[in-house]
């Protein structure tokens, strides 16, 4: 019995080695290329002459919306038979384009089919969808949700004008124009863009605004906001996260600084600061007993305030007890920036070159 078992093991081992050798021969004689071709995901290209609304229904793909090279709208993506990425379903009705995920069916036909699709992904992107909008055309509305809420660039909008948005994703805008709407962002960045009549909730994440204009915009619940060469029009309100040590860095273009009303304030809240640092107490004496050495705590508290530098040094900061305020009044101007915060560092200065 043992002899038969030994023979069976030897035969199995030899067969395995032979299989690996044959697979290697196939690999080095072009078999792997053929495997890629057979198992490649299906590329989908759709063209439309007229669209006014785009709805993207909670897909796991990154979305890239950009300017088209011709007068048509184009949608490009790839579906995989083996559903390593949930396949997409596309529908269009009366100018409304809808993208949604199909139910996964897992049609894997053996390890070689799976391997082939993995290899094919080197040249066919199954993780993103591209939507192209003709130059000079304006989308009436863009609605969308992404599974990759905190990922940089899960929604990229470039060289496109949109009248209204309703988005929940990580957002990157490049030379984009948004006229109205609401955005819930795990990450938000706008470069050379214009935002109007828009509310942004940053979910305690980062907001970056570079050479961008805000007009009647509210941005709330961010952890860090960096704005360089910012243009302010109309009434704009920034409200950082209340329960952490937030940072707001602002640098306005000269024209905006000369024509703006500023109302900036931050309040030191010891209890909230202590909770952010992991301490819970009822009295200040209890906090001192819990912390022991208060030097680190005091160092963090010193970061709370309004700080000016460069062209902003002439602006006066009023300090009273645990509150600091900076007010600049231009009665003839309709432009204003209001920042109301707790336990925040607010810097008005020209960014240091990297």
Explain the meaning of each model-derived region:
Residues 1-5:
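Positively charged n-region of N-terminal signal peptides that target proteins for export
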Residues 176-181, 186, 190-354:
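Short, surface-exposed interaction patches in beta-rich subdomains
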């Amino acid at each position: 019995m043992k002899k038969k078992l030994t023979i069976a093991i030897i035969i199995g081992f030899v067969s395995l080695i032979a299989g690996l050798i044959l697979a290697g021969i196939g690999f080095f004689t072009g078999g792997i290329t053929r495997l890629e071709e057979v198992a490649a995901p299906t590329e989908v290209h759709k063209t439309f002459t007229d669209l006014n609304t785009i709805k993207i229904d909670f897909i796991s793909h990154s979305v890239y919306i950009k300017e088209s090279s011709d007068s048509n709208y184009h949608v490009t993506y790839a579906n995989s038979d083996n559903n390593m990425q949930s396949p997409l379903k596309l529908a269009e009705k009366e100018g409304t384009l809808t993208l949604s995920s199909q139910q996964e069916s897992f049609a894997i036909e053996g390890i070689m089919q799976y391997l082939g699709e993995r290899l094919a992904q080197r040249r066919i992107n199954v993780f993103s969808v591209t939507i192209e909008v003709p130059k000079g055309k304006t989308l009436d509305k863009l609605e969308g949700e992404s599974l990759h809420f905190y990922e940089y660039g899960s929604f990229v909008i470039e060289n496109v004008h949109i009248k209204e948005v309703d988005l929940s994703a990580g957002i990157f805008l490049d030379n984009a124009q948004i006229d109205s709407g609401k955005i819930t962002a795990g990450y938000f960045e706008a470069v050379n863009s214009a935002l109007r009549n828009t509310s942004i909730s940053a979910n305690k994440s980062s907001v970056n605004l570079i050479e961008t204009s805000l007009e009647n915009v509210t941005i709330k619940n961010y952890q860090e906001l960096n704005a360089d060469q910012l243009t302010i029009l109309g009434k704009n309100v920034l409200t950082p996260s209340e329960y952490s040590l937030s940072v707001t860095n602002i640098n306005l273009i000269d024209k905006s600084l000369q024509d703006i009303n500023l109302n900036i304030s931050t309040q030191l809240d010891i209890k909230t600061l202590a909770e952010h640092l992991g301490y819970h107490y009822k009295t200040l004496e209890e906090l001192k007993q819990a912390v022991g050495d208060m030097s680190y705590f005091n160092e963090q508290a010193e970061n709370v305030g309004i700080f000016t530098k460069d062209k902003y040094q002439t602006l006066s900061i009023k300090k009273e007890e645990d509150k600091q305020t900076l007010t600049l009044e231009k009665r003839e101007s309709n432009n204003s920036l209001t920042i109301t915060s707790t336990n925040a560092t607010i810097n008005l200065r020209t960014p240091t070159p990297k």
